Amino acid sequence: IVVKADGLAAGKGVVVAQTEAEAIEAVNAMMEDHIFGASGGRIVIEECMVGEEASLLAFVDGKTIVPMISAQDHKRIFDNDEGPNTGGMGAYAPAPVVTPEIRKEVEEKILKPVVDGLKQEGITYQGCLYAGLMITADGPKVVEFNCRFGDPETQAVLPLLDGDLAQIMYACAKGTLTADMVHWKDAAACCVIMASAGYPASSHKGDVISGLDAVDKEDVMVFHSCLLYTSP
């Protein structure tokens, strides 16, 4: 089964329990030890879906939905998909597991019903809608939704955008989004996360990051997160 903290936990509030003992340990850690603070005061226990994970983000203006290139996030801290889940140790785009047929199914049977359902409840959803998916033998299933861009998927997806992101987001806000506004490069991108020692349980703080001046290739970008800049 899967044990989840019901609140925000920076992408780390999920434990895939292989045994009853692991499930009990996860529940106790969240609800008694409060490892996620108030976010773990209530938990969700779900079926553990078997398949390959993928993320499909979409631009939405309230009525029009334009999916982005698919991506796959890798959450385990160690190589070979081992260790605890993190906020994401890397991602690549596009994800081959999301075939054109699956992409169409997700758009029509998952994204559109969500946007339409929100509208029926008086919510005009505009911006980025993130669908975390499990591609199973029975087709795509929803793992989670986020009302934001994915991290680290975005770092792999947006460099492939062949257009003006600001104009696209403005169209989302104004309700004038069209599919022909969004174009993608015929390429692939990969994002690799560098994290401090101890992550994700208790990250070491204060380490100096050096060597970034060596990153001088046109097709390589460095994105910063959770750090403090101080002058030499």
How should each PLM-predicted stretch be described?
Residues I1-Q18:
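Hydrophobic alpha-helical hairpins/lids featuring a short glycine-rich hinge
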Residues V2, M30, L177-A179:
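A generic local structural motif
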Residues V2, V44-E46, F223:
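Structural detector of well-ordered beta-strand residues that form the stable sheet scaffold
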Residues K4, G87, V192:
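Residue-level signal for inorganic ion chemistry
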Residues G13-T154:
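Internal nucleotide-binding/catalytic subdomain
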Residues V106-L129, N146-D219, H224-C226:
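Active-site "cap" helix and flanking loop/linker of ATP-utilizing ligase/carboxylase catalytic domains
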Residues Y229-P232:
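Conserved small/polar residues in nucleotide/adenosyl-binding loops
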